[in-house]
């Protein structure tokens, strides 16, 4: 692996977003809620091998955009980008991406508060729902212009921006795969 051993112990938690999405579907079904919900679990085995991604590889995301790999540790967003594009084919009213996307979120908000980013309306509704259920969430912006840190000379964008604003930058990257008008 490319991570230091101390960080590898935490990687089993990288599937927490997919687990939360799956459990949400089970809970909705058990409660018999009158809603139509689909969960897209963006799953991948991340192991080094001769066919693993390398720095400077250019990948084509589902839907056609190309991404230059500049950081092999920013791999989760590549899988999520595929899932976001595919999920939009179902014309959903709302897409909620649940992910342990970046350690920058923990640096910014600690271990108990989740950062929430998105359109103002959707983000605010999620924060209110979280408050009602006792889950601390904090609304975060997606600064305009943040996507410029993902500029690439060989692809539509890179998979990693600069070091500042890591959580916000990761969201700006994923926003590139969501069509205008989708919440």
Task: Cite the ranges covered by each PLM segment.
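A generic structural signal for tightly packed, nonpolar segments enriched in small/aliphatic residues
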Residues: 1-183
């Amino acid at each position: 692996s490319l991570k230091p051993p101390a960080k590898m112990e935490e990687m089993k938690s990288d599937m927490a977003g997919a687990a939360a999405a799956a459990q949400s579907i089970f809970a909705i079904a058990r409660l018999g809620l009158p809603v139509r919900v689909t969960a897209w679990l963006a799953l991948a085995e991340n192991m080094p091998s001769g066919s693993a991604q390398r720095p400077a590889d250019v990948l084509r995301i589902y839907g056609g955009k190309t991404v230059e790999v500049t950081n092999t540790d920013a791999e989760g967003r590549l899988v999520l980008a595929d899932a976001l594009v595919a999920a939009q084919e179902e014309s959903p009213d709302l897409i909620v991406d649940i992910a342990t996307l970046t350690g920058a979120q923990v640096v910014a908000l600690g271990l108990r508060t989740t950062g929430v980013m998105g359109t103002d309306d959707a983000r605010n509704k999620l924060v209110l729902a979280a408050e009602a259920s006792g889950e601390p969430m904090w609304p975060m912006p997606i600064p305009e212009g943040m996507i410029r840190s993902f500029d690439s000379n060989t692809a539509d964008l890179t998979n990693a921006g600069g070091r500042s604003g890591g959580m916000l930058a990761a969201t700006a990257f994923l926003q590139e795969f969501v069509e205008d008008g989708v919440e």
